[in-house]
């Protein structure tokens, strides 16, 4: 009896660019040997809009509304970095109150970013229930943003050179504290549902392992780096804004797998809540309604009319010129290090405006860590990286 030989040549499969678990318009050209991944080539660029070139043809005030559409889960972070770069180049001081307001917005955005990562990631690996819970919590963050900026998800257009566009509305800090009190137990609820679930743990433990040296050599940042045993957080390293005023810890794990990345993001949400609570209590001038009452009672000479109690140093004129020089400014977003290299030539628009997106760099290691895994693991590993194609393609 003759025995039929099975096919042994590799098979090439296309994932995306419109696959439901692709997290945007990413295409993966995957070479398979049976069920095993032999090679993977990411094809990017489907969402390229020329954001850097747009920046070089707009003034800063005109450009801020554009940037939140790059990464719609991290709009506030991109607004912050786009104003930080010219601010530092022109040595423009930021009032303490404005800095605290910025921190409040950034930490709310960090929680919103991690929630939008958590739901789809768990859905990718088969846990559907938390997917519906995360939108309930995000809705509360959107309500806070809508009260302060007028917009919910993107186009907040809130950050300005020297501060923010407007002070916090009356009662906003109380609502923010209410959110912190309400959200803390919800994180415990997620952990109860997921963290010690044996099916979930067997599904992702030991998957997509990245060692400490590998993470550093591939220039990873954010939870991808911290999950590999490198406690590197720009909020501690660069001392930007007023993060040094608060008591909080850098979340890190040592295993470097998908489960470690999940644990880091869960812990980061807890640390963000700690920062939010402290910022609400310590903000110079306190709630807006109290600050206004002090100013009205004490008149123009009141200490509460001083520089550090303002929400913006000085409103930026449309003719504000970015001085000669070049500078790289960076901050820690929910996905990692985002940065802007700006080159000014004493004009209202920058000569060069290079954007470093965290998920763009983090995505580069995907082919390296996919090799040897099963085809069913592709979505779990890709999901653990946390990419949004708007900022990868820019």
Swiss-Prot record:
GO molecular function: NAD binding; oxidoreductase activity, acting on NAD(P)H, quinone or similar compound as acceptor; quinone binding
Pfam families assigned to the protein according to its UniProt record, in alphabetical order: Complex1_49kDa
Localization terms from the record: Cellular thylakoid membrane
Enzyme Commission code: 7.1.1.-
Record has NADP as a keyword: yes
Biological process, per Gene Ontology: photosynthesis, light reaction
Protein keywords: Membrane, NAD, NADP, Plastoquinone, Quinone, Thylakoid, Translocase, Transport
Enzyme class: translocase
Family matches, as PROSITE patterns: COMPLEX1_49K
Its membrane topology: Peripheral membrane protein
InterPro entries tied to this protein: NADH_Q_OxRdtase_suD, NADH_UbQ_OxRdtase_49kDa_CS, NDH1_su_D/H, NiFe-Hase_large
Record-linked SUPFAM superfamilies: HydB/Nqo4-like
Catalysed reaction, written as an equation: a plastoquinone + NADH + (n+1) H(+)(in) = a plastoquinol + NAD(+) + n H(+)(out); a plastoquinone + NADPH + (n+1) H(+)(in) = a plastoquinol + NADP(+) + n H(+)(out)
Principal cellular location given in the protein's record: membrane
Gene Ontology CC terms: plasma membrane-derived thylakoid membrane
Source domain of life: Bacteria
Recorded family membership: Belongs to the complex I 49 kDa subunit family.
Function as written in the Swiss-Prot or TrEMBL entry: NDH-1 shuttles electrons from an unknown electron donor, via FMN and iron-sulfur (Fe-S) centers, to quinones in the respiratory and/or the photosynthetic chain. The immediate electron acceptor for the enzyme in this species is believed to be plastoquinone. Couples the redox reaction to proton translocation, and thus conserves the redox energy in a proton gradient. Cyanobacterial NDH-1 also plays a role in inorganic carbon-concentration.
The protein's assembly and partners: NDH-1 can be composed of about 15 different subunits; different subcomplexes with different compositions have been identified which probably have different functions.
Name of the protein: NAD(P)H-quinone oxidoreductase subunit H
Organism: Synechococcus sp. (strain CC9311)
